[in-house]
């Protein structure tokens, strides 16, 4: 029975290194579908099986909305550390680390370009920058963008994706809620449209200010929208919240939103809204000099 002792070597690959690059596939956190990266990008980071909306970066958001190229403004503004704040690490160090990892100076990008052939001012928030939190720079850039829109008679689109006011900047961050809201009031008096797009998540001081002040408040499907998070609310009231509470569909049903729109249809919806409220085009770039 010597043949029992015969051991054959396993078949070896001619190339022992894997030929499949890392990061080529993405697993959907909702349905566990494995999606090819290029297919996901082609669908604007929406799952091709269950329509789960992955988060977009600010740059990806601008690419999904503008017709082509755009001009970014106030690129040099960056946060300082006025309170010398320290939690688990100094705020100054946290800023340095985040700037290095994201390649951005703060949590919002403001730009002008065209949507559906019309000049528009767009602000897109970046969640990977300290949770998209709103500090002095975010408030200043959005306010300048709104003022530019008023000067050049252009509509405004703000895409929110934020955990709220930035606690490391204390009352200075809370002031931005009033500052942006006041700028939007001036935009309203100028009879220029403001479209607010709420994405997952939009919470805290951002929800309590400019995110809910749009002439049209549009949310992406299943986006978490609220002031305090559901876990905090449950711990405070000691009750279980209803199914889907603080999700965009729940808010639409209860009159807090105008519509819930799939990301793949968002640009067309915004284009139609802008057509209804369009004004004649004004000459000149939407650039505003720094205020003292």
Language model segments and positions:
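Intrinsically disordered, low-complexity segments enriched in small/flexible residues
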Residues: 1-104, 112-115, 273-292
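Conserved catalytic cores of soluble enzyme domains
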Residues: 160-278
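Short glycine-rich loop/turn motifs
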Residues: 106-110, 119, 154-155, 192
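A structural preference for short, pocket-lining loop segments at secondary-structure junctions
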Residues: 115-124, 141-165
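Structural motif
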Residues: 38, 125, 159, 197-198
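Glycine-rich anion/phosphate-binding loops
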Residues: 97, 101-107, 132-147
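A generic structural signal for short coil/turn motifs at secondary-structure boundaries
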Residues: 37, 130-134, 166-169
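Conserved mixed alpha/beta catalytic, RNA-binding, or beta-rich assembly cores of soluble enzyme
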Residues: 127-128, 134-143, 151, 173-177, ...
């Amino acid at each position: 029975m010597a043949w029992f002792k015969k051991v054959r070597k396993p078949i070896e690959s001619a190339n022992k290194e894997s030929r499949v690059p890392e990061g080529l596939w993405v697993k959907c956190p909702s349905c566990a579908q494995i999606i090819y990266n290029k297919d996901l990008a082609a669908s604007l980071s929406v799952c091709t099986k269950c329509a789960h909306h992955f988060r977009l970066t600010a740059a990806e958001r601008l690419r999904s909305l503008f017709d082509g190229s755009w001009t970014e403004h106030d690129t040099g503004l960056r946060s300082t550390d006025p309170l010398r704040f320290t939690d688990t690490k100094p705020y100054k160090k946290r800023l340095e680390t985040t700037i290095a990892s994201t390649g951005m100076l703060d949590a919002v990008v403001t730009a002008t370009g065209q949507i559906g052939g019309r000049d528009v001012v767009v602000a897109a928030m970046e969640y990977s920058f300290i949770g998209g939190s709103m500090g002095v720079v975010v408030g200043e850039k959005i306010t300048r963008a709104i003022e530019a829109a008023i000067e050049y008679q252009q509509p405004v689109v703000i895409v929110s994706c934020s955990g709220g006011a930035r606690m490391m900047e204390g009352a200075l961050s809370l002031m931005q809620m009033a500052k942006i809201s006041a700028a939007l009031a001036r935009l309203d008096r100028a009879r220029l449209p403001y479209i607010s797009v709420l994405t997952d998540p939009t919470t805290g001081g951002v929800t309590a200010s400019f995110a809910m002040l749009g002439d049209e408040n549009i949310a992406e499907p299943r986006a978490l929208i609220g002031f305090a998070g559901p876990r905090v609310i449950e711990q405070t009231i000691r009750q279980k919240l209803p199914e889907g509470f603080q999700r965009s569909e729940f808010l639409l049903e209860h009159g807090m939103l105008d519509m819930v729109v799939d990301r793949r249809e968002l640009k067309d919806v915004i284009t139609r809204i802008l057509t209804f409220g369009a004004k004649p085009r004004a000459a000149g770039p939407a650039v505003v000099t720094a205020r003292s």
